[in-house]
């Protein structure tokens, strides 16, 4: 039994869009599984818990019962119909990975085990972070597919640091760690801008690896259709989205607000376009700091992003046959 891997999230509502709660991952039967992973690996003992650890529950609790009823049952112009398109699609919320604030490595081990069980059940994983260390155990779990996976990364920052303060698995290092995983093949990085933890050496390391880096200036110049064209066709893909990759006018609740990110129309086009190119095995949305939100605007766009991902996957025929 693996009930110890996850625990029920907060209350009112306690699951994303009031989808059924399923914390027994040994008996998982779902097309789409939502999983909260609250904690990355800290660089300092005082940095855990951080505000990002509140995001999984904040995203779940941002919608009222009325909002949920409309979102699940009414016509959605983003999708051209109801969220699940009237199809027999099973979405579950697996709760949050059980935390052990005294043993952060154990938290990562639990996150990886949970993700492996979700992937092994042929469920599409939607992980809610947490800071950007969270995808590291999830990407390790992609090993279960035994195929090369294209990693698609949206972020203001490159995330290629080997270590910070001696820690190799924190929020500045997920793409470096991914590049070391034999099952990660092509890496496409979108939206880089401003100043982050990367130095000249990390940028060169990414280039030497062969990462396709499309900074925000090139992205806006060439357009999202060309960005999508540069991503290899067919998949499979794993998508990791740092909220600061999206423009702070629509996602202000981040720790590193940097102007010039993806706007909503680009986000929607990107999500639908990637899903139509091939199978997206899973995605994560990380680095939301709820305490910095303005008028709930970040939560609104987070919910819209996730719903567009779900609705696009349904319409792409992911769960037929």
Task: Go through each PLM region and give its residues.
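Conserved alpha-helical scaffold segments that buttress catalytic/binding sites
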Residues: 2-321
